[in-house]
Design a protein with these regions (language model features):
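Surface-exposed binding/hinge segments that line
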Residues: 29-30, 85, 96, 129-174, ...
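Periplasmic binding protein-like
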Residues: 37, 106, 385-435, 467-470
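N-terminal lobe/hinge region of extracytoplasmic solute-binding protein
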Residues: 38-88, 119, 185
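Periplasmic-binding protein-like
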Residues: 47, 265, 290, 294-331, ...
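Aromatic- and charge-enriched surface segment that lines or borders ligand/interaction sites
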Residues: 82-127, 140, 146-148, 246, ...
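Structural transition elements
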Residues: 190, 320-357, 373-376
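Extracytoplasmic/peripheral linker and loop segments enriched in polar/acidic and small residues
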Residues: 344, 395-404, 431-498, 516
Length: 516
């Protein structure tokens, strides 16, 4: 029975994603050349086990690969593994590895590398709790790797496909490297060339790449990947108008993060197109539940009461849609009716009542944001005005995105409220939310959420799993660990006369893409 339960989790996102990825016309691929991509910022680190930011992950998934990966519709598919067997009531997972896979340094990948990677992940990753229930590993031969868990986990394979904090396979030589100090040696189609942290990064074709020849084409992050490009140059350009100008003048082939107004400037230009992805991410206000004022749930709930979603969306100008839930409506775990009571409250009078109960006396509330993503900055600025209407002393701090992102994930920087977007958890389903739920709001202890996640992971009964997820979402929103803003879309611009093979996805992928 449990293998069926495992499969049921892997199919949760099909209804969401399928309409996005219709077949694209066949085009003639050409090999060679450099594609120039202008994005909002550069990565702080290329250690996959610590990577939760899109600007890091878009690069990381070109260099590194996982045992199982997301396909085009976000289901789990074998990647570095050729086969996965689940046994012992979903407590034993046996991975048969593809033979002949090489790292970018020419070394063949074996089960020793896989085991060393799992062991390093458990020591350094932000998402190390993924492996907290491991009893032992076995590597009986170079192409077999076995994970033994202490308890049933019906969603273990589903968790391994995650694109955030990905459990990629590194050479065993990296096992003892501290966090953020790993060498960029991967099995992916590209390898790191040049990296100037305030300017640009260049990926080069990995000549040692071993494609999965059992597949006809790439499929999400799985399947047959081909590096047609000699190189990809990532230019870090924080200003959206400057990115658009780079596309219009031919200095960039692809650009990130267009607002609706900027995207309209491409209308009527036959050589330039917009790549639209929706749903893409979900935007939230994140409240630091272990720091100062926002350690008090009454303060967090007061902040929730002032939020006027329409005013925020009007200010940001991004592609968006209202939705109170942590998931998208096609999901069988969607809890929109329950979540609605915590959404778009716009009730400053209620906020004042909660502030009085909390004993608030005009202390400074720090709102931290960044200048790289205008929608984040503008959201925080609008929120600060809404907070002031309720009598909250809001102090806005604008820093760079990578500092903002690191502070969000580490809890550093003395902030109370920030904002960001989460892309993979809403698409991939309830199990993927666990690391996000705990990491970003810095929840110290919440027994109700702990127990519900335990039921979600271990139960073989679908109604029980649904009830567990509804309990998690209800508690999470009630305690205002985060406040939902909206579902958001992505608008990217590209030169259609020069770029071929580019397909919509919530990450840009430059394998199986070429320049004409």
């Amino acid at each position: 029975m449990l293998p069926r339960i495992v499969r049921s989790f892997l199919l949760l996102s099909v209804a969401v994603a399928a309409p996005l990825f219709a077949a694209f016309p066949s085009q003639a691929q050409t090999k060679g050349g450099t594609l120039v991509y202008s994005t909002v910022a550069g990565p702080a680190s290329l250690d996959p086990y610590m990577a939760g930011s899109l600007v890091e992950l878009e690069i990381i998934h070109e260099i590194f690969e996982t045992l199982v990966a997301m396909d085009e519709n976000y289901n789990a598919r074998p990647m570095l593994a050729s086969k996965v067997e689940v046994g012992n009531e979903a407590k034993t997972f046996t991975f048969t590895l593809r033979k002949g896979v090489k790292f970018s340094n020419g070394q063949e990948m074996t089960s020793a590398d896989v085991q060393a990677s799992f062991e390093r992940y458990a020591k350094v990753s932000t998402n190390a709790s993924l492996l907290a229930d491991v009893e032992k590993y076995e590597a009986p031969d170079p192409y077999t790797f076995i994970v033994h868990l202490k308890n049933t986990n019906a969603v273990f394979i589903d968790l391994l496909k995650s694109s955030t904090y990905p459990l990629v396979v590194l050479p065993a030589s990296q096992k003892d490297k501290p966090a953020r100090e790993v060498e960029t040696i991967g099995t992916g189609p590209f390898k790191l060339g040049e990296w100037q942290k305030d300017s640009h990064l260049i990926l080069l074709r990995n000549e040692n790449y071993t494609a999965d020849e059992t597949a006809k084409d790439s499929d999400g992050f799985a399947g047959k990947k081909t590096a047609y490009l000699d190189s990809v140059r990532y230019n870090f350009i924080p200003e959206a108008n400057a990115r658009l100008a780079a596309l219009q003048t031919g200095k960039s082939d692809v650009i990130a993060d267009l607002t609706l107004d900027l995207a309209k400037r491409l209308d009527g230009n036959a050589g330039l197109s917009t790549l639209k992805t929706f749903p893409y991410c979900q935007q939230y206000f994140v409240l630091h539940s272990s720091n100062g004022l926002t350690a008090n749930p009454l303060i967090r709930q007061a902040i929730r009461e002032v939020v006027n979603v329409d005013d925020i969306l009007a200010a940001t100008g991004i592609l968006s849609q209202r939705n109170p839930s942590l998931l998208y409506p096609p999901s069988p775990y969607y809890a929109g009716d329950m979540a609605a009571k915590y959404y778009d409250r716009k009730d400053p009078a209620k906020a004042k009542e909660l502030l009085k109960q909390a004993g608030y006396n005009g202390e400074k509330l720090v709102l931290q944001t960044n200048s790289n993503y205008p929608y984040m900055r503008d959201s925080i600025l609008v929120l600060s005005e809404q907070l002031k209407e309720a009598g909250i002393n809001a102090d806005v701090q604008v820093i760079d995105w990578m500092s903002n992102s690191n502070n969000l994930q580490r809890g550093t920087g003395n902030w109370n409220v920030s904002t960001t977007s989460f892309c993979s958890p809403p698409l991939l389903g309830p199990p993927q939310w666990k690391s996000t739920v705990y990491t970003f709001p810095h929840i110290d202890k919440d027994p109700a959420i702990d127990a519900a996640f335990d039921n979600l992971f271990k139960s073989a009964d679908e109604p029980t799993r649904k009830a567990a997820w509804f309990a998690i979402e209800s508690r999470f929103l009630d305690q205002a660990y985060m406040i939902k803003v909206a579902d958001t879309g992505s608008l990217r611009g590209y030169n259609n006369t020069r770029v071929g093979g580019l397909r919509p996805y919530f990450y840009l992928r430059f394998f199986n893409t070429w320049v004409k």
